[in-house]
Curated annotation (Swiss-Prot):
Compositional bias per record (Basic and acidic residues), positions renumbered to this chain: 9-18, 63-79, 195-207, 902-911
Protein name: Ribosome biogenesis protein NOC1
One of the Pfam families matching this protein, by short name: CBF
Composition bias type Low complexity, residue spans: 962-972
Annotated organism of origin: Chaetomium thermophilum (strain DSM 1495 / CBS 144.50 / IMI 039719) (Thermochaetoides thermophila)
Source lineage: Eukaryota, Fungi, Dikarya, Ascomycota, Pezizomycotina
Gene that specifies this protein: NOC1
Amino acid sequence: MGLKRAARQQRDIGKPAFDEEALVELTGKIDKTLPAVEQKIAGKRKRQNASDDGRGSKRRQTHPTEAEEHRDSHAAAKDKANRILLEEIIALGGDEKDLELVADVDSGNEGGGGPSQPKISSEQSLDQSFKDELAKFAASLGFHQFHNREDLNTEDEASPDEDAVGSTTDVSSDSDEGGGQEEMEKEDVDSFSDNEEKVTEKVDSGEAKIIPQDTKKGKQFRNLIIDPRPDWHAFPLDELPASRPDHPGKYSASIANLKSYAESLLEEDTANYQSAQAHSSTRKFMSTIMSSGTLSDKISALTLSIQESPLHNRKAFESLITLAGKKNRGQAIAALGALVDLLGNGAVLPDDRRLRPFGGQPALFGALQGSASQTWVAGQTLPGKLTKAHLVMWAYEDWLKAAYFRIIQLLEVWCSDEIEYSRSRALDFVFGLLKNKPEQEANLLRLLVNKLGDRERKIASRASYLLLQLLNVHPGMKGIVIGTVEQEVLLKPGQSLRTKYTAINTLNQTILSTREPSIADKLLRIYFDMFLALLKSGVLGNVGALNGDKRDGGTPRKKSNPSGSLTVGNEQDVAQKLVSALLTGVNRAIPFATTEDSTLEKHLDTLFRITHSSNFNTSIQALMLIQQLATSKQLAVDRFYRTLYESLLDPRLVTSSKHALYLNLIFRAMKNDADVRRVKAFVKRLIQILTLHQPSFTCGVLFLISELQKTFPDLRTLLDDPEEADDDGEEVYKDVCEDGTLDNVETQGVTSSFVSPATAYDGRKRDPEHSNAHRSCLWELTPLLSHYHPSVGIFARNLLSPQQSLPKPDLAHHTLMHFLDKFVYRNPKAEETKRGGSIMQPVLASGGTSRIVVSSKAAAKQQQSVNSASFWNLKPEQVLAEDVFFHEYFTRIGKPGKMTRKRDETKREFGSGDETGDEDEIWDALVKSKPDVEGPNVDDDSDADLGDFDYSDDEEDGSRTDGSMSDIGMDSDGFEGIFDDAGESDEQSSGEDEAPTKAKKGTATSGQKGRLSKKELKTLPTFASAEDYADILAAEDDGLDD
């Protein structure tokens, strides 16, 4: 048997391990062997039964009993299964005949009915189709690949089992009396079991070979000092004591030697890593991409290599830095983007600390101090507890710090590029590194701050936005950012006003807190220093100083103007914007500052000087700041009120665009004032200047005075109490004699109406307290009661005799533009969001609305359109005063169907008189809503004069020779139709019946006249006859009524 087994092994070695041929041969042997095995098993059973018969009677009695019990239980189980099967067949519509057909059929037998085969045959028989499918599946698995790689030890380990099986077979064959036939049968069975065991062993050996390949990949890096990992700085190292020596210079030689040795270790570790990766499929794929791939593919391959192990891929790092330094902008920007992703968002740089140079490692000095010798050279034992891993890590960290600095230098170059896109991308890269990592933050912050002075406003605004975003992410950097902006922009000579304006605009949006009063104090100091610098340079008042800074010789230095768009006027506007930004910053910083009152009082004089600048809007902001200081700190209160009182007469107030801001300032100042006489003087002057302003400002002032009456009820004395003269007594009159001497006569007890100058109102006083406004009356309110704007009249009458609480007026509702917009009937604009990019913007919109007396223009956009049905259906008492005319017009003739019919008929009857008819309708409605608009004593003579005026215009023009008398009559008689409208409203039914004939007559009259030449027009009489006027008027009125 050993020779046969060796022959089978030699035969199997030359064959595939588990292919289709082997499987077919295997299944064939199974088919041949199974019948012999069955006969053998049957013979054994017969011999066993014969031997059992020769034993004791007890043995012969028990076995039949157990067999009978087994047969009975098997029959009972079979009957139960047949009953269940019969129930299922009946449920499906069958009967007992169907049960007989399938009763003895095995569930695995597809050949039809018939008695079931023995159990051994049913379990081990294979269908031919299944064998074919199994052979194809085994061939697709590719197990034959592992035949050549099979380890011989596996067969050696399996040989004892085979020997055991063979010995057992020999023993059984020797004891068997069947001889050679049974021996051959057993040999065939052994061959089947051997083949089956070999297949199993080879499959197992293939799986065992796959697992060591994974472990082998980990074993490749056993020779490395530092394991490959993306976060190299998180590699576990033994902790070393850190110390700072008093004299680090004595260790310089040892540090230099250790650094050289560490660099050699890093090179060796990198070489080992590269050799371990040389034959990997990933490395081959990377090499293919680097040799034949596109630029983006190369950058991606380099990035992936660095991400696997930054410490062992310095060469890939250098390649990316080289690409970032190319002159090609596309390559450089793409490489810089990859580097920023690695260094900013990736794990290459530590998040919680900066990189240290090799000589700056604290643990290095601790190790050198613990060593016996002060000088270390290569070949000696490492000092202290230093290991090679420490040295490799420190050497790479030193190299990475230098490489990172080179990247920042490249970013600085691209931040100054000529192309705007390159500068914008480089700016974003700088922000990405500065936001995510603390390494080189001072240099990165300097680059970002310097872009506030970029020649393109878009880039400068972008830099300002990124700085604010940086402060939101890192609030602890406020002091650093403010100091850098001051040093690099505000105090740096040669910076333009536009750059300083952008810088101040960035600083005044810094989020302040009561927990950081030093930040607010620092900002206040910067703001006031800028105020003084602007005042000394004369930029605010001297236009000539805007041309440039003066040199020592006195000649102005030319400023660079890259865009060529900035002129002297533009620079002056920028200066005013700069002052406005400074005032905004002071307003926001004062509530959080802890500056002493003496320091603020020194700067108040600067603010008062700004109130007299050329821009009135800037003066308003300065007054707002002074008012805040005067209220909270009680500084220069009287001077503030004098300046505010004087600003009411400033002619620039009429054209200012900050009326709402100014009225709010007046309201807060008056409400916080404790002197009623001063408040009355302000009210008196406010009423006096209203005749110079537009209705919007007038309505705001009247509403402001009505609100002040709630705080100061004594203001009613200006309206209710008459003026009285303060006389010291009765005046004494003396007669003059003829000789010129005075004779004493009796005093006459007549009260004089003369008011002494000491008690009379004097509006020219600088101090409002001394103007004696409290002794006068508001006579200036009388013209406002009959103001041409209806809203002004309503507010004035309500102020004189309060009857109802009027809503807060919106200045934008009473402007001329808003009035004209009502005739356009356009859709309202979308509401603008109040929250912008700055977190400081919503303060005015949300928190400050409770103190605003007059709102902004936002509500004007939300007013409903006058040509909408919701406006037509309003009751007359619900309509605002300025909208009464529109409501009357659309209520009477604003229905769409009626207007269309009237226009069609008017076009048909009067031709081009459609536009004139519409104007007459509008004028009619206007006079209806306000009768006094036409004026008193309107008679026919005035109409005739108006007709003559129109006639003379036509005569001078000479181009309009078709001006028919009917059209002239319509224009001149439009006023008369208004007066007759009320009387004709009751007779509309009769007028409609007579309209067709009169219209025809009017049309015929117009057609008979035709076109008149200029000479014929001159010969026409000035006045027409009464009959002609009657016909024309009848035709006109009937046509309009239709």
